[in-house]
């Protein structure tokens, strides 16, 4: 039969069923003390390491094996590849596994495409400007023809 035991909050001894005293502080923290002596020392805020009979003191002076203290396992971050908006997971993996020469060739290809696109945009703008310029010139000519001034004598006042 296994007996459920607790540990004293001050001296760290085992507390068997029917023993000890539970203390709840004003801030809601719960303590479990083995004896009245442990409770009084804890409430007076005496450090357990300064009291010779506590396990904290024995641990400080290396009288207790360090293997008794459980060590926490380190959390290791696991990297997971996920798709990004616009690029699928397969595309990301393909780009990761490319050789340096392939990467360089792809980069050059992308640069060439960008330059070509810019050149096309510039030519388009120039063509639009030429068309606009012709329209403006034609409109000006039409205005000048419509509003011809009457020919009269040149000169000053009479």
From Swiss-Prot:
PANTHER family the UniProt entry points to: 60S RIBOSOMAL PROTEIN L24 (PTHR10792), RIBOSOMAL PROTEIN L24 (PTHR10792:SF1)
UniProt organism field: Tetrahymena thermophila (strain SB210)
Record-linked InterPro entries: L24e/L24_sf, Ribosomal_eL24, Ribosomal_eL24-rel_N
Parts forming coiled coils: none
GO biological process, one term: cytoplasmic translation
Example of a GO MF term: structural constituent of ribosome
Family affiliation: Belongs to the eukaryotic ribosomal protein eL24 family.
SUPFAM superfamilies in UniProt: Glucocorticoid receptor-like (DNA-binding domain)
Keywords noted in UniProt: Ribonucleoprotein, Ribosomal protein
Protein name: Large ribosomal subunit protein eL24
Lineage of origin: Eukaryota, Sar, Alveolata, Ciliophora, Intramacronucleata
Pfam family, any one: Ribosomal_L24e
Keyword Ribosomal protein applies: yes
Basic and acidic residues biased stretches: 98-146
Cellular component terms per the entry's GO annotation: cytosolic large ribosomal subunit
CDD domains linked: Ribosomal_L24e_L24 (cd00472)
Region (Disordered), start-end ranges: 98-158
Gene for this chain: RPL24
Top-rank taxon, per record: Eukaryota
Gene3D superfamilies associated with the record: 6.10.250.1270, Ribosomal protein L24e
């Amino acid at each position: 039969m296994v007996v459920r035991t607790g540990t004293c909050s001050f001296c760290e001894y085992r507390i068997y069923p029917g023993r000890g005293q539970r203390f709840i502080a004003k801030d809601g923290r719960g303590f479990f003390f083995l004896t009245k002596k442990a409770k009084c020392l804890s409430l007076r805020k005496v450090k357990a390491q300064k009291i010779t009979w506590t396990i904290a003191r024995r641990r400080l002076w290396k009288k207790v094996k360090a293997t008794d203290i459980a060590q926490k396992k380190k959390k290791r971050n696991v990297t997971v590849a996920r798709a990004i908006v616009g690029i699928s997971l397969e595309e990301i993996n393909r780009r990761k596994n490319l050789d340096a020469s392939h990467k360089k060739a792809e980069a050059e290809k992308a640069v060439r495409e960008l330059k070509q696109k810019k050149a096309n945009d510039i030519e388009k703008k120039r063509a639009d400007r030429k068309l606009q310029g012709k329209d403006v010139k034609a409109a000006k000519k039409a205005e000048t023809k419509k509003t011809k001034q009457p020919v009269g004598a040149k000169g000053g006042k009479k």
